[in-house]
Amino acid sequence: MASASYHISNLLEKMTSSGKDFRFMATNDLMTELQKDSIKLDDDSERKVVKMILKLQEDKNGEVQNLAVKCLGPLVSKVKEYQVETIVDTLCTNMLSDKEQLRDISSIGLKTVIGELPPASSGSALAANVCKKITGRLTSAIAKQEDVSVQLEALDIMADMLSRQGGLLVNFHPSILTCLLPQLTSPRLAVRKRTIIALGHLVMSCGNIVFVGLIEHLLSELSKNDSMSTTRTYIQCIAAISRQAGHRIGEYLEKIIPLVVKFCNVDDDELREYCIQAFESFVRRCPKEVYPHVSTIINICLKYLTYDPNYNYDDEDEDENAMDADGGDDDDQGSDDEYSDDGDMSWKVRRAAAKCLDAVVSTRHEMLPEFYKTVSPALISRFKEREENVKADVFHAYLSLLKQTRPVQSWLCDPDAMEQGETPLTMLQSQVPNIVKALHKQMKEKSVKTRQCCFNMLTELVNVLPGALTQHIPVLVPGIIFSLNDESSSSNLKIDALSCLYVILCNHSPQVFHPHVQALVPPVVACVGDPFYKITSEALLVTQQLVKVIRPLDQPSSFDATPYIKDVFTCTIKRLKAADIDQDVKERAISCMGQIICNLGDNLGSDLPNTLQIFLERLKNEITRLTTVKALTLIAGSPLKIDLRPVLGEGVPILASFLRKNQRALKLGTLSALDILIKNYSDSLTAAMIDAVLDELPPLISESDMHVSQMAISFLTTLAKVYPSSLSKISGSILNELIGLVRSPLLQGGALSAMLDFFQALVVTGTNNLGYMDLLRMLTGPVYSQSTALTHKQSYYSIAKCVAALTRACPKEGPAVVGQFIQDVKNSRSTDSIRLLALLSLGEVGHHIDLSGQLELKSVILEAFSSPSEEVKSAASYALGSISVGNLPEYLPFVLQEITSQPKRQYLLLHSLKEIISSASVVGLKPYVENIWALLLKHCECAEEGTRNVVAECLGKLTLIDPETLLPRLKGYLISGSSYARSSVVTAVKFTISDHPQPIDPLLKNCIGDFLKTLEDPDLNVRRVALVTFNSAAHNKPSLIRDLLDTVLPHLYNETKVRKELIREVEMGPFKHTVDDGLDIRKAAFECMYTLLDSCLDRLDIFEFLNHVEDGLKDHYDIKMLTFLMLVRLSTLCPSAVLQRLDRLVEPLRATCTTKVKANSVKQEFEKQDELKRSAMRAVAALLTIPEAEKSPLMSEFQSQISSNPELAAIFESIQKDSSSTNLESMDTS
């Protein structure tokens, strides 16, 4: 430390040197010292350093001065508080100096100090004291109005300080406001402008009294309207406040908007611009409060969008009618540009109107149909706007409209799910001709910006409405070619033109382009040869799509591709051979050439083997291998049967080696390639090649990656069918892995289906030691030997399915095996595991093979219903149902008879019936529907809820068989006097809803409202199941309930409230325990709310929704967890609405995070509280992603509370790490 002090005193001495270079070097060295973490200054050194740095602010040399100012940053954090106050005092005094240079350098110094202070959320006393010291000096400097340059600097620093440390200055806010308000009438516009910026930062952190004072002042001054100049300033100020604190100004809009509307009618273009900008900020920042005024705002914007008093557009309109595909004469281009009037401000009004319409369109999704009636035609008519900047904003507004129209989810464009009448998509479709007509002329404008806007517009239009331009291609192609050929086109314009062409090619049928191929190929080929890699890359993508157009393989085509093959091939091969090109170009050249060979390979002659050799080289390169594998897969699957023999000998072993690489996408791609090669080129593959692949397979068959396993099993199935002799090699490790996977509880879905296909293909190959009985023993052996216990029930189901698959493939073996399984069930010495497997296997076999010849089967299964093991009973129930499907006339009457005569076994028998209804064919079941229906209705009033649920599921699935007859019958039971019956039929409806179109859907849509009326049922349980059914509809088929939301939501929200009358105390020994009978129904209501965010967001009043979310944040553990999830979703979906409610949301979150569990609580309580804290923190992290959320005083206070609490800080940090790693994963496209 002594040496550091000595070194610094040495530097201080040099700073007094008369040589400016010495002073400069010494100051620079001091800067370096101050930036070291290790430096510690004693009191004396601190005083001397501070004094010297302040003295150097007045140095004669500018460079020394600047360095001295930079030293202030690190110095502030290295010296004691009173020294920082000395620095600030001196800088404030110097800021008022007569010397301009000293004033300037002191202002920079103050900004540097403020920038270095710890943030308000850290709770630092230093920051608070320094800011208080500066504030007093600044307010007096601003209020004096003596020297404008001092005022401007002071306002600048004030704004900076309020934005960084506003929360610390709450006590000064009234005096800051008092000094700022008079500056709004300053004769200098620059002063007014900076005052508005400072006020914008003030409103983010000031208390309500100050905020109300400011708004009242602005409203009263606007009402007086003393001078046009100040009125303009006040309107700008209101817009700035709205932008910074929209959530606070909302309640004053009823007073503000009529004034702003009035000023729009004043003949002053600047004022009009500011008024419309204010509307834009209200629309974006106060969505709820502005709602009643949106129509007025739209009308004003539409009026001023065309406001161009000094220019006549009439001649152009006539021009527009003469639209032709050749584009006419280009000599008249740019005539608009010749018109100029420097005093004309009307373009600013038009631009403000376009931006405001953009804001309205982007934020009011529910008004889309209205926008297509009024806003869309108006914007289209303004594509001809003469002022380029305004035109760009008009285009941007229309792009926003298209983006809002893009179907977000499949149900929006699913014809079954469409609401009746005109939809935004059909309205847009009808306006496409007008859009194309308006764009046609713009596409040959000189302006690059305008043409880029046209391409963006066409791209978005085709993404929203694929096929929309089918009739208009002849008109648009010349415009695209114009930009591709234009020497003056910028690179970005060419890229946009190519990208637009690509999207159009992808979304229209090939025939549409055939008349234009001759015109399109040359410019695209020229772009492939462009020296700029981004243009080449985009052009290769277009070329690949053009290849599919000139020779489509999936439909008959009479188009002659021959004239274009040479050009397309030559330009692509040149790029394919080049070694030093960009990675993107390399990959796209490979993909494009793959497409050329796939579609045109029979025309390439001697070029084909040479090109395939290049592919072989690319296969050996780590960077290009995955793209090459995909290209080879495409070629191998071509119906042209391309000759791949020249490369298979070397290529297949390379592909085999990829299966051991630690790159998942490469493994999956390689398995696809090998599969198609085996299917289409089996005669060209040798046993050695196949063995090389088989050697690599065992590690791929594993439960750790089911998708890779599925692909590997599918490959083996193909091999068994095409190359059965190779399977003798799999009896070792591959088969062990397969059998191991069958026992995995994770084997289901696609992987299980692949496994069943494989066993069926394998058993018929007749391979040694892999016959029916061999495989059966391998599959079932462990269960019989009891050597390895199968812990998971799913494993027994998988083995049973495999046994059934083998038996279906070898039906002659069936009777003996079925007989054996029946004996296993009967045998008193059989373990439960053996019985379980035998019953499930009987069920799976009987599902596909009629077992009615097995006379004792019924009695054996019924006997198993009495087993002490629940799993065996359940398996017997499943087996009976599944066997019945194999022969309905034999077994179904028997099951119905048993349900009637065996009340004790009813529950299990109903499960058998459910299996029959779920799995049997509609035709087979039709004759029995009436009998089953009558039986089920007898049991729908059963007091046992489990039985009622099975009955309801049976009723629902039965209704799907004959909806016209049965749905009205279900509806009739809604008026039953039994609440059990009502709950059964409402639950039954849940089982008629699925996520794909069904014949019942239109009928269901007409009557689901009647079922949902049970949300008003007096019985709590009926209301709960109504919510569960509603949730299922909202999740799987939102179109059923979208139009009912206005009626349903009040009842839904009603069920989110805690009901005191449903809370009771239960005595358990010496303890009293509180039971809340309303918890389940509240949970169901909140689950519905969560679902609606995904499926019906545009139909929700988000502020009403948030009211109930707020209540949920204070509810029971389960409900808090749900509402925390909702906050995370809402932060992304409607950030501006959440921002308005932020202060009300923070408190319950803080309460959750700071709750302490009693020391004597059980471990489960601690775990629950920990999970609650983590979920609450996730919600906080999501809220903080909303722009400007951290500016809320309550939120920043909560943040500082989190950072000062080690436990909370650790949780918060880990959550932020998790979310950032998740984002990275989602960006990883491999």
From Swiss-Prot:
Set out the biological process GO terms recorded for this chain's protein.
Answer: protein ubiquitination; SCF complex assembly
Positions where Phosphoserine occurs in the chain: 335, 558
Region Disordered: what ranges?
A: 315-343
Per UniProt, subcellular location reads as: Cytoplasm; Nucleus
What keywords sit in the KW lines? Acetylation, Cytoplasm, Nucleus, Phosphoprotein, Repeat, Ubl conjugation pathway
**Residue numbers bearing the N6-acetyllysine modification:** 55, 971
Q: State the HEAT repeat positions.
A: 2-39, 44-81, 83-119, 131-165, 171-208, 210-247, 248-282, 289-366, 370-407, 424-467, 471-510, 515-552, 563-602, 606-643, 646-683, 688-725, 729-768, 770-808, 809-845, 852-889, 890-927, 928-960, 961-998, 1002-1039, 1043-1097, 1099-1133, 1140-1189
> Which Gene Ontology cellular component annotation is one that this UniProt entry carries?
cullin-RING ubiquitin ligase complex
Entry annotated with the keyword Plastid: no
Q: Which domain of life is it from?
A: Eukaryota
First-listed, main subcellular location of the protein, grouped into a coarse class: cytoplasm
For this protein, the record's SUPFAM superfamilies field holds: ARM repeat (SSF48371)
Residues carrying N-acetylalanine = 2
Q: Which InterPro entries match?
A: ARM-like (IPR011989), ARM-type_fold (IPR016024), CAND1/CAND2 (IPR039852), TATA-bd_TIP120 (IPR013932)
**Could you tell me which PANTHER family the record lists for this protein?**
TIP120 (PTHR12696)
* Family recorded in the similarity comment: Belongs to the CAND family.
**Assembly description:** Interacts with TBP. Part of a complex that contains CUL1 and RBX1. Interacts with unneddylated cullins: interacts with CUL1, CUL2, CUL3, CUL4A, CUL4B and CUL5. Does not bind neddylated CUL1. Interaction with cullins is abolished in presence of COMMD1, which antagonizes with CAND1 for interacting with cullins. Interacts with ERCC6. Interacts with DCUN1D1, DCUN1D2, DCUN1D3, DCUN1D4 and DCUN1D5; these interactions are bridged by cullins and strongly inhibits the neddylation of cullins.
Q: What does this protein do?
A: Key assembly factor of SCF (SKP1-CUL1-F-box protein) E3 ubiquitin ligase complexes that promotes the exchange of the substrate-recognition F-box subunit in SCF complexes, thereby playing a key role in the cellular repertoire of SCF complexes. Acts as a F-box protein exchange factor. The exchange activity of CAND1 is coupled with cycles of neddylation conjugation: in the deneddylated state, cullin-binding CAND1 binds CUL1-RBX1, increasing dissociation of the SCF complex and promoting exchange of the F-box protein. Probably plays a similar role in other cullin-RING E3 ubiquitin ligase complexes.
Annotated protein name in UniProt = Cullin-associated NEDD8-dissociated protein 1
What is the gene called? CAND1
